Amino acid sequence: MVNKEITFLINSLGGGGAQNLCVNIANGLASRGWDVSLIVLNAKKSVFHKRINKKVNFKILGTSNTRYSFNVLHNYIKTEKPSKLVVFNYELTVMMYFVRLVSLKKFILISRNINTISKKKENLKGIWIKYFVFPLINFFYKKADHIVNQCKSMQDDIVKHYKLDVKKTSVIYNPVNGIIEKHLLKYEIESKKEGYLLCVGRLESQKSFNYSIIAFSNVLKIFPNLRLKILGEGSLKNELIDLTITLGVNDKVDFIGFSSDVISYYSKAKATILSSLYEGFPNVLIESISLGTPVVSFDCKSGPREIIENGINGYLSNYLDVNDLEAKILLTLNKRWNYKSVAESAHKFKLDLALNNWETLLI
């Protein structure tokens, strides 16, 4: 008999892409008859817990972070005895390797790779992360039984970085948010766009919103009535606000913060802009095109090249080239888009396809 029991482990359910995906996959598998458990370390800034399907066994372990999680995780494994564990975090994967070692419990340890590992290594900050946490990750992360990557370029990167057997890895594209899919069953693609560009994500160095703001300030010379809306929170908010003041565009840039109504922002934007230094697989681009809004993105590692079809659903910009980013935004604003065709380009990212792939992996 097929064992359809699976446990997902993540640090929290804050407003990030990994957390969103974790809930979507857990809900989807539970709806397909799986015995699903979703375990989080803590409920800090929890955004997605209200969306968890009642069929999912949800448990909060009550520990502040991964560093202090060994005892509660060890107790959980001894008590619940999961057969398969999918972990959505580098540090947690390493911790679970040690828990398995000490507990002598046999379970399959699967890790979902959340970023382009080589780029993450290049952009480490902080003594604790750089000289202790990441060296541990670098040595022990590959001890997971299987690593799921969000796109082909991520898979290529991690196989090369760790010299892994490619059979120990797989690719499962992130699906379109289930809430967006439900929205699209009820409503037509929005054809009346409003006068703004959109950026979505954490206000942190990896997302490098400064490039988007600079490009936008130049685009204003051609489209003076345009606005830029930025959805997200983070430690660089004040620094980015200062940049808008320096560029003289602070009256044209709206820092919205976190919003639960992201569908409305995507649907009505003229375009969504992504200027990240690197990504795992940018859900922002998938969400935008699925709602019919074209995208402009740096050709960063990894993901944009596997999502964007130039002239069909948006444009790729040369990496870290703010002048080319500006040029591609202007190209997007001047083009007459078939918004339904933009949305159709997201077909390969449907939730059902992702769930099929997860089931194939887990059975």
Where are these regions (language model features)?
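N-terminal strand-loop element at the rim of the active site
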Residues: 3, 8-67, 235
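A conserved mid-protein helix/loop that constitutes part of the nucleotide-sugar donor-binding site
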Residues: 16-24, 195-221, 235-241
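Membrane-proximal helix-turn-helix segments that form the acceptor-binding/catalytic region
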Residues: 74, 128-147
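Short His-centered aromatic/hydrophobic patch
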Residues: 87-95, 113-114
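A short, active-site helix/loop in glycosyltransferases that binds the activated sugar's phosphate group
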Residues: 142-169, 176-178
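Aromatic "clamp/platform" in nucleotide-sugar-dependent glycosyltransferases that forms part
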Residues: 258, 277
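Short hydrophobic beta-strand element within catalytic cores of glycosyltransferases
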Residues: 294-298
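Conserved acidic donor-binding segment of nucleotide-sugar-dependent glycosyltransferases
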Residues: 309-322, 330-336
